[in-house]
Amino acid sequence: MKNYILLLLVAVCFSCKNENTSIDTSSVEGHKTKLTANDIVNKSIEVSGGEKFKQSSLKFEFRDVYYQALRKNHEFLLVRILVKDNDSIFDMLSNVGFERYDNKDFVKLEDSIAKTYEASVNSVHYFSVLPYGLNDEAVNKTLLADEQIKGKDYYKVKVTFNENGGGEDFEDVFVYWFDKQSFKLDYLAYSYNEASGIGMRFREAYNERYVNGLRFVDYNNYKTKSTGFVLENLGKEFENNQLELLSKIELEHVEVQLINN
């Protein structure tokens, strides 16, 4: 596994290229024909960077922690680097599984702990490149009724996951709001299991920027003020000021290199 990771990282150094391009979404128009959930997600991925995600090396910081992601064809390597004093902890999730290293030394973990770390690493990387990832095999998409938020019309898509391939948190449920004109992802909500029951979050995208042709956003992260909310209705609850700002999800120092085939 260690040699596999080193080979991938070395390959990136020799095969990356910079392309200072941006995505032109001005020609995207609304469609009179009925679009499916897959159609909407595909168009959203396209205006967010499309196939470039599949051949990319990303670096960013989130809450003073370093993250790196390498995607090349059907191979991937997702890394979290925790730095303290002179020590560095590397959490690595790839096609072959999860591993942790303390500097250069492999750390053997109990399965339950390893799964917790794996889910944590995967979650940050998952949100960082949305809507990319919504066409994974374990994803199930359902088109809900259109909705208007703050005067803009949105397609609304619900996402669930198969247990097989859906990860540790396969029972989580997501709802995504895509602008009907640009197909960009502006809002999302999700439910998750916690000790006290079902938790919910709603996120509002802001600070859109394209880095080497890939779209990145930050999020205002909201929680419900009380119990009894319905996940699919959080867009309206947000518009009616029924949600409370909990935190901000900000990706800093984002770098993108595109990889040659």
Where are these regions (language model features)?
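Flexible, processing/modification-adjacent segments and terminal tails
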Residues: 100-168, 195-196, 250, 260
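Intrinsically disordered terminal and processing segments
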Residues: 34, 38, 47, 51, ...
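Solvent-exposed N-terminal domain segments of exported/luminal and surface proteins
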Residues: 50-93
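Gly/Pro-enriched, hydrophobic low-complexity segments
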Residues: 155-254
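C-terminal motif of bacterial Sec signal peptides marking the signal peptidase cleavage site
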Residues: 12-15
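N-terminal leader/targeting segments and the immediate start of mature chains
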Residues: 17-62
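Short, hydrophobic/aromatic-rich segments at coil-to-beta transitions
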Residues: 53-59, 73-80, 150-158, 185-187, ...
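Positively charged n-region of N-terminal signal peptides that target proteins for export
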Residues: 1-4, 17-18
